[in-house]
């Protein structure tokens, strides 16, 4: 086992650029749900939820009467969905997804023709009924479509967005308006180009939040499969670069806007499911990560995003049916039963929910060490440490998990406890050796939480 010693001094801490106060983790961590989302079970993991709310559930076509909360397929959004979620103290974000009115419908352009007035009324009715200023108080934000990308005519999307956003403002000005998925790069199949779709002076006042989706997929051409994913810190994925580019654009062009990552995640299915791959997922040798890696990479992603001037991050997805395909096995639960990631995310929320990111203490190829401080007691600190390494989903040597022994010095206070990343119902303390100046413990690719006595 390798041994590494890391020395820190106060000037080294101050060398890292800090940003304005980060959100508490409880106001940062979110999850993507849907009709069958169980708010009681997933309340253990976070308090922010995002729902895919299809417009074609509400009406048969744009222009039809708007009848919230009951829609044309007889779903009652209050009693069947948002009411249940708010009863468990979830703050809900509504993704008004175009569904069958979107680019998958070859006649989508004609569906929206001459519907500018209806778009305004739809946004107004939605905000007035569901928004925080109304009687029901079921949601606090509305996203105007999910992933229209470059397949949806941009001029048409902008028209829909402007009219719907103005309607939302008229219906409830307290509702935060969120863009569709948009990056500060050229548009692709899943995302719009912030610089073209949302930079116009007429658009900027109509939204409050920039919306990102990012997945740790390899750059094109590295593997046969276009879906191969890697660990969050990997150099062969634009996973974090997408966020950095968007933060930079926001700071320069729209500094008053929040940034939410509304989708990120990892698939992990069972060997039994893998044996049943079919179609392109079999031909191109699609593979997910292991259950342990899913837990590791989700926690590390939350920690990384918290350090990047991002206001929220919603993981995808709440549950899966153990399907061997992209997004088919990305749940925290599998057929309703917790995976290791469920316990890991619940632990992060429980342990650091009242903490906010403070600074990066160390970031090397061998160690990431982040500092978090408690909400109203800034002398209560927690360090989170992990090895920023891992395996790609197409690599088979995944049982050789790396472990090293490290010594940290120049501690801010006396170490109280080290919690190992939780992957089952039981939490585990990690063994460590410490004195007033240093602490030694074993480190792996699973983050650990180093809690200190209050600084005197």
How should each PLM-predicted stretch be described?
Residues 205, 209, 214-250, 279-292, ...:
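Substrate-binding surface in catalytic domains of secreted glycosidases
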Residues 428-456:
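C-terminal beta-strand-rich structural cap/linker in extracellular carbohydrate-active enzymes
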Residues 44-228:
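Substrate-binding cleft and catalytic face of glycoside hydrolase catalytic domains
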Residues 363-413:
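Carbohydrate-binding surface patches
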Residues 49, 126, 142, 164, ...:
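Conserved, mostly hydrophobic/aromatic
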Residues 31, 163-194, 238-270, 310-322:
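Aromatic-lined carbohydrate-recognition surfaces of secreted/lumenal glycan-active proteins
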């Amino acid at each position: 086992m390798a041994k590494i010693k890391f020395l820190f001094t106060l000037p080294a801490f101050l060398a890292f650029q800090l940003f304005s106060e980060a959100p508490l983790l409880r106001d940062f961590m979110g999850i993507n749900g849907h009709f069958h989302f169980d708010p009681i079970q997933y309340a253990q993991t976070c308090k922010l939820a995002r729902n895919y709310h299809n417009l074609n559930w509400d009406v048969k076509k744009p222009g039809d009467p708007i009848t919230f909360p009951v829609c044309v397929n007889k779903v009652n959004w209050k009693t069947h969905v948002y009411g249940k979620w708010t009863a468990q103290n979830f703050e809900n974000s509504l993704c008004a997804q175009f569904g069958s009115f979107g680019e998958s419908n070859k006649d989508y352009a004609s569906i929206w023709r001459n519907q500018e007035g209806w778009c305004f009324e739809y946004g107004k009715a939605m905000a007035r009924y569901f928004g925080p200023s109304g009687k029901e108080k079921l949601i606090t934000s509305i996203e105007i479509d999910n992933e229209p990308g470059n397949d949806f005519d941009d001029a048409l999307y902008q028209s829909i967005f402007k009219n719907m956003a103005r309607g939302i403002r008229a219906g409830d000005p307290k509702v935060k308006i969120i863009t569709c998925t948009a990056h500060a790069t050229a548009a692709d199949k899943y995302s719009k180009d912030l610089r073209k779709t949302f930079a116009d002076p007429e658009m900027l006042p109509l939204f409050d939040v920039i919306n990102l989706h990012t997945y740790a997929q390899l750059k094109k051409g590295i593997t046969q499969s276009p879906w191969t994913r890697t660990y969050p810190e990997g150099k062969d994925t634009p996973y974090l670069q997408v966020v950095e580019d968007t933060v930079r654009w926001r700071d320069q062009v729209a500094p008053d806007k929040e940034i939410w990552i509304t989708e990120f995640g990892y698939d992990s299915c069972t060997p039994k499911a893998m044996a049943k791959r079919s179609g392109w997922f079999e031909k191109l040798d699609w593979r997910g990560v292991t259950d342990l890696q899913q837990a590791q990479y989700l926690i590390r992603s939350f920690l990384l995003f918290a350090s990047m001037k991002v206001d929220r991050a919603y993981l995808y997805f709440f549950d899966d049916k153990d399907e061997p395909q992209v997004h088919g096995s990305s749940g925290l639960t599998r057929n309703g039963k917790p995976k290791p990631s469920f316990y890991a995310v619940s632990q992060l929320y429980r342990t650091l929910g009242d903490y906010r990111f403070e600074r990066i203490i160390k970031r090397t190829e061998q160690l990431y060490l982040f500092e978090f401080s408690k909400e109203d007691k800034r002398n209560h600190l927690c360090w989170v440490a992990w090895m920023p390494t891992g395996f790609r989903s197409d690599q088979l040597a995944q049982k050789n998990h790396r472990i090293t022994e490290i010594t940290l010095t120049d501690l801010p206070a006396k170490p109280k406890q080290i919690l190992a990343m939780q992957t089952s119902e039981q939490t585990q303390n990690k063994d460590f050796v410490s004195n007033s100046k240093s602490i030694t413990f074993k480190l792996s690719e699973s983050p650990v939480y180093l809690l200190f006595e209050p600084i005197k």
